[in-house]
Amino acid sequence: MADSRVRVGVLFGGESPEHEVSLRSAKNVIEAIDRERYDIVLIGIDRRGRWHLADESSFLRHASDPRRIRLPHAPVRLALTPGRRPRIVSVVPQSREGSGESEDSGEERPEPAELPELDVIFPVLHGPFGEDGTVQGLLRLAHLPFVGPGILGSAVCMDKDVAKRLLRDAGIPVAPFITVLSRAEAPSWDEAVAALDAPIFVKPANMGSSVGVSKAETDADYQRALDGAFSFDTKVLLERTIRGREIEISVLGNETPEASIPGEIAPTHAFYSYEAKYLDHDGADLLIPADLDAETTARAREVAVRAFRALCCEGMARVDLFLATEPCGPLPSGSLVINEINTLPGFTRISMYPKLWDASGVSYPELIDRLIRLAIERAERDERLASAIDLQGVGEANHGEAGSG
């Protein structure tokens, strides 16, 4: 009897500094997915960007200790060939690399082997080369359905500068900020404080998980923060500190997105840094649901969906915002201010995205099921749109009509 299960490629790892976070998220997705409905193929991306066919038991064994989690050695390399009938093929095993053998060494090379066709890809990737539109573009070229926002939504949300400008133009409040395009052009500490007040957050424009983010309270802090941020990106944001509560909302859907109940992050560190998120088990208290009145809860959910739509998101995203407890420039106390939108949020044991949906009545396996169905529905919708092939046929028909007249 043929296997009727949907075949899902779980794509994880990657080149970004958030590699380990991706591995932790992938472990949870792999363990939670309904095996009666889905047949999974593990595709690991190493730190050099190479794709590998990963063995599930080996990966889960290496992932059992979060302090030593790593992508295990995999002998089979993979390549994706784009087109309307995409193929994932195995290539020369890793053991041949570095052997000194040339392409014409005379030794017979193994023929590429094609893997069974995948129905959908679940990218469990974080940061650059994962959630910034690059992988999404490759999968779109291959006509492979994939979970999460498309190329535009992924790219826009990854770039904090572009995202904030689009949100601001849509009438959605964001923290006052300055964009710096090179270390040499950075304003002095006094100039930055005059524009934004102190303390100031310094952030790489295109990183996630608070990687490279610093809070500057003095000139010395500021100079170190700039050096650190520019080591991760060529564009850096200087951002005014919003004094308030950190609220997070999970959003799910395509044309008609839904918002979860709000949760709250109460950091025990100076801010919710990478260390607080992933290295210190006591780095923050996660409060679900957030202690908000009904009116504020409704406002928060509404602005989360507005932001999701304004930044062209589909599938899923986690919307991070502040509930201001003090006035911030023109924004009064009580304002809801968007911090950022994470298009491929974490799925680790402490991650808010699945936790918020679980508290909203959507279990982890059901959430994965809905995300996969949304990916397939979107791909089917997009495939119905007119293509260059379709337009060529229309053009030829019109040309024939014009000639016959």
List PLM regions with ranges:
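Glycine-rich phosphate-binding loop of ATP-grasp-fold ATP-dependent ligases
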Residues: 22, 174-179, 200-224, 246-248, ...
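ATP-dependent carboxylate activation and anion-phosphoryl transfer catalytic cores
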Residues: 2-6, 12-15, 35, 171, ...
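Hydrophobic beta-strand scaffold residues
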Residues: 40, 145-146, 174, 200, ...
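Basic phosphate/pyrophosphate-binding loop/patch that engages nucleotide-derived ligands
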Residues: 166-174, 228
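Phosphate-binding site of ATP-dependent enzymes
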Residues: 217-302, 323-337
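ATP-binding N-terminal substructure of ATP-dependent carboxylate-amine bond-forming enzymes
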Residues: 1-147, 151-152, 156-158, 162, ...
